[in-house]
Amino acid sequence: MAHVFGIDIGGTGIKGAPVDLENGKLLAERVKLDTPQPATPEAVAATVAELTTGFGWTGPAGITFPGVVVNGVVMTAANVDEHWIGTDARELFSKATGLSVEVINDADAAGLAEMKYGVGAGENGTVLMLTLGTGIGSALFIDGILVPNTEFGHIEIHGKDAEKRAAESAREGEGLTWGKWAGRVDHYLEHMERLLSPQLIIIGGGISRKSDKFLPLLTGLRARVVAATLQNDAGIVGAAMVAPSA
């Protein structure tokens, strides 16, 4: 099926659109709704249903989630209510929308999209995609195959989760200059390079639109470091890629 619906759940917004899997393009302008607060399973499911209903969608859908997802079940929850842990999200969203759905980690979805339709297309070997936003999401690929749920943003550096130091939210929250923040990102990437030896590191998330501000400041890395090209549509497109029968 070439046309499917993708939904990207974030800590502040839930966005969705139909996607053409032939080319990875959105078939309509995406719609973004506020993530309910508190972001309980029931409240988020209702918002997801509002999105699909608004488009009159009756086909399959893929949905991202900001946490570890194993066989449709949420194992960790970042930036959403802790009651998600242990929830069968696939069943919950299917009942709420009346659709056939699949659920995937948000960074993994963005990585899948970037590896098929974006800057990672055709890349073999070890590729690491990192989304720098509220936190740090990660997607690891070995010869094009996803290693799911890596959660490398939670690796400890200087006694803190890496995302507390190197996410975009740290730059904004601490008022860091681009140079100061780039130094933190550089240190984090050096750490990841020692662990994984990737040939390519892709930087995604909204910050990828400002890559000229910090990518030239990264030094000492063997890997190529490039900005993602799908930017904020990557999650929607990647979600659509894992939709049932997609």
List each model region and its residues.
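ATP-binding/phosphotransfer module of carbohydrate and carboxylate kinases, centering on a glycine-rich
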Residues: 1-61, 69-73, 91-99, 113-129, ...
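Extracytoplasmic strand-loop-helix segments at the start of, or within, the mature domains
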Residues: 136
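General beta-strand structural signal in soluble alpha/beta enzymes
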Residues: 101-106
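Conserved NAD(P)H cofactor-binding loop of Rossmann-fold oxidoreductase domains
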Residues: 66
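A charged helix-plus-loop insertion that forms the helical arch/lid used to bind
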Residues: 74-86
